[in-house]
Amino acid sequence: MKRLSVLCSLLLVAAALGTELPLATPCDEEACKLPDCRCSSTNIPGGLRARDTPQFVTVTFDDGINVINIETYREVLYGRSNSNRCPAGATFYVSHEYTNYQLVNELYNRGFEIALHSISHRTPQAFWADATYQNLVQEIGDQKRQMAHFASIPASAIKGVRIPFLQMSGNTSFQVMADFDLLYDCTWPTTALTNPGLWPYTLHHESIQDCIIPPCPTASIPGPWVLPMISWRDLNNFPCSMVDGCFFTPDRTDEEGWFKFILTNFERHYLGNRAPFGFFVHEWFISSNPAIKRAFVRFMDIINNLNDVFMVNSAEVIDWVKNPVPIDRYRQQQCKFTMPSICRPSFCGPLTGTHNQLSYYMTICNTCPRNYPWVGNPLGQ
């Protein structure tokens, strides 16, 4: 109890300090140097020519992992490799409620990236816009510990964040990321910097990125990287950040139309400055639309056989930007290796949610908690 009290006190102090962050100033490329600092820019890292630059593709899925959507992930992702014979990656931004942590462990052991998407994923969206430092410590900082504990994966492997509803929280979320040793955020869409696309950057200095869902950060916050969500363009040239958010699209039964739609958006990157191409989606959209699923699989089949395209975990993009090398050298690098993490599964329940008095069941890689884990009590103690 005493330890908890001390922790709460430290968090309150940190929250108070949150109002004293220095305002970001325009970026000086002579002073802001890799690997730890990069100005927001459409310039290719390392001054590489586009034809010498690896085209990274980041496939991401949001929300909880369960026995239903794991079947889609197994079907479309498992066993894929890039042309350099390294396993193809994908990133899962996982929210806590109804997540099966044994399956999170399975995805991690398959080499996919596990990232944070909040404990509660609560509504309304305005909560996230107005979230305090303390709110985001409990939703994001505590989720890192929760994820590591229940999924039996190293906390050091949890590097990314996506805030629910793509709702920016100003400086606050990035301050929490800096304080909890999180590497990058992939919440911030850009519709203005898509052709050429905006490359990842740090927040040491003022960002040039357009603020689509305010508030956006204005302070100088060394440490966290921004992995921009470069918007797609639908058939009427309207921007969309998530694939399932595009409005004017081919008919959902039109496999060929969707294949061409995906390829057109990909080529904007591939034939341009090769900024990372994101396929940001919710699993339900793939599983409930078989023609779109087939088009998606065809797209992955093509890029997995191109010598200059690499489907990777999102954190790997940041790693490359920190130390940019041309395609020929990148292809010679050793494949990433995930040290297997053992899951000793426990099926727990009914567990009472102290926030709503509902009964929950959960599968975890640890001993069962006394209560259903939630905001303010991430381990269910």
Curated annotation (Swiss-Prot):
Glycosylation sites: N171
Entry's localization field: Secreted
InterPro entries linked: CE4 (IPR052740), Glyco_hydro/deAcase_b/a-brl (IPR011330), NODB_dom (IPR002509)
Effect of Q125A: Moderately impairs specific activity
EC number(s) from the headed UniProt entry: 3.5.1.41
Disulfide bonds: C27-C39, C32-C37, C86-C335, C211-C216, C240-C246, C343-C365, C348-C368
Signal peptide interval: 1-18
GO molecular function: chitin deacetylase activity; zinc ion binding
A single Gene Ontology CC term: extracellular space
UniProt keyword Oxidoreductase present: no
Cofactor(s) this protein cannot do without: Zn(2+)
Expression tissues: Strongly expressed in the midgut. Has little or no expression in other tissues tested.
Catalyzed reactions: [(1->4)-N-acetyl-beta-D-glucosaminyl](n) + n H2O = chitosan + n acetate
Single GO biological process annotation from the record: polysaccharide catabolic process
Alphabetized CDD domains for the sequence: CE4_CDA_like_2
Classification via Pfam families: Polysacc_deac_1
Keywords annotated in UniProt: Carbohydrate metabolism, Chitin degradation, Disulfide bond, Glycoprotein, Hydrolase, Metal-binding, Polysaccharide degradation, Secreted, Signal, Zinc
Induction: Strongly down-regulated in response to 20-hydroxyecdysone (20E). Up-regulated in response to juvenile hormone analog.
Superkingdom per UniProt: Eukaryota
Record-listed Zn(2+) binding positions: D63, H117, H121
Function: Hydrolyzes the N-acetamido groups of N-acetyl-D-glucosamine (GlcNAc) residues in chitin. Shows activity towards the chitinous oligomers GlcNAc(3), GlcNAc(4), GlcNAc(5) and GlcNAc(6), but not GlcNAc or GlcNAc(2). Requires the substrate to occupy subsites 0, +1, and +2 for optimum catalysis.
Family: Belongs to the carbohydrate esterase 4 (CE4) family.
Protein name: Chitin deacetylase 8
Lineage: Eukaryota, Metazoa, Ecdysozoa, Arthropoda, Hexapoda
